Amino acid sequence: LAALSNGEVKLDNALWSEDTQVMVDALRQLGYKIEVNLDSLESGNRNLIIQGRGGSIPKGGTPENPMELFVGNAGTAARFLTAFLCLGKGTYRLSGISRMHERPQASLIEALRTLGYCIDSKNNKLPLTIHAGGPTFKSCRVSIEESSQFASALLLLAKLGGWNVEIDGELGAKSPYVAMTSSLIDCFPTEGGRLKIEPDASSGSYFWAAGHILSLNNCLPLKVARWPKSGWQIDAEFTSFLPLPNIVSRRDDLGDSIMTAIVIAPLTGHQTQFVNLERLRLQECERVQALRTELTKCGATIQEAGESLTISPGELKGAEIETYDDHRIAMSFAALGLKVPGIRIKNPCCVRKTFPTFFYKLAAPAPHGLGATILDGKGNKLKAEQLIAG
């Protein structure tokens, strides 16, 4: 939105992570001027200054030599840039890591083709080649069964493209992420200005979960500072699900923070069922299988049926956790490790995708962190400053 604006836009408190850098790098490669400055209040954030180009998207390459843009495993960047580049001129090619090439993109590609754009892809996934065509002033329908990012991508570009976007099914009207996109579009300073970005509630869930499970040992209460209050983020509701109820839905109750809830569920004094988990299978890894496998290692009793997991209460033990290069697997089990001794996280640097300072926050002394003891593979205590994922 800032790149599409008619002036200079300052974005304060922007999370600085691998996903953010992927988007900034792609826009810079296209020719946008973006200044990145340190945030004096939070070391893990940046203040960005973006020079908007009034809806003019820089020209790509030719069909024989398209402009190459790499998105890593950033699903948001992949989906948003796919729609964004359709409104440029010339030819662009989007690619990512192997897992990104497995993740769904078909509903978005089909909607853009309905709008009149030519997109080449062997299987309606990345890598793909976009032959841009500018505004088309047409209508399309899009399904968000696999990801609400498909609708968000189209809505962000709808005004510039002259698109009328309709969302299929009941999920469209109820999706909190689609509602958040619409709210942001309505309040964004499109003529230039400043926008303060609120903290990410999904990332905050690990600390609320830690506070909850540690309170079972009568530890001092833990509070997450500057908790989001806009009402836009579904995961801001995480605190209302502590202690966990009997049933939690990925579709109706929580977003990504449902993974946090699943991991701490064995510590609840009753059986908990998690339903509507189908989207978890299509993200950074096959998350339903990963959660079941790693929790079982820790001694949890889990039943998988269709798109649900039923978890029984019970005592847990330490285990080596395979993260599948998934940041949320690493962070969820790290939070569990504050309660269960012996949790060992493989490839902890995967948290750089969305929260590079996560382990720093665990180890830093209060009030800036939890003061947790974190050991390396040889049993040596690590300082907080050593735990920032580069």
For each feature predicted by the language model, list its residue ranges.
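Structural preference for solvent-exposed beta-strand-turn elements
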Residues: 1-390
